[in-house]
Amino acid sequence: MMGGGGGGGGGGQMQQVAQEIEQMEQEVEAIDEEIERLREKQTDIDEAIEAIETLDSGSTVQVPLGGDAYIRATIEDIDEVVVSLGGGYSAEREQDGAVSTLETKKETLDDHISDLQEEKAEVETEMEELEQQAQQMQQQQMQQMMQQQEQEDE
């Protein structure tokens, strides 16, 4: 069902290029989603840092229990903060140490986002090259079809 004949497998090649472009579009979308997820984590870290720096002992806060349920709690001691270290481990840190740990996490996220942006740029460049290749193939097919039509008309 390759119309016109004489395409020399160009249709299959076009289909392969189109599939590669589609895969790359999906890869770019996945990278964008991961970048967005990491930026949300950065926002969470910023909010945690702000809370650590602004809350005082005796402040009342809402503590999430899960399932969109909260309780009000009064902070007894803001001098010690429990910070997740990753891998399911947590550690108690003084206020400054907690902020420092969170800032380090944020820097790590920045690095990861930069790596993902570079990867995305590489994929997009490769995708542009493939799109140009597809356009050239399409133009060649059109020229071949026009030549065949001219020959058939003679």
Swiss-Prot record:
Taxonomic superkingdom: Archaea
Pfam families: Prefoldin
Chain spans, region Disordered: 119-154
Annotated Gene3D superfamilies: 1.10.287.370
Keywords: Chaperone, Cytoplasm
One BP annotation, GO: protein folding
InterPro entries, per the entry: PFD_alpha_archaea, Prefoldin, Prefoldin_subunit_alpha
Family: Belongs to the prefoldin subunit alpha family.
Name the UniProt record assigns to this protein: Prefoldin subunit alpha
Organism: Haloarcula marismortui (strain ATCC 43049 / DSM 3752 / JCM 8966 / VKM B-1809)
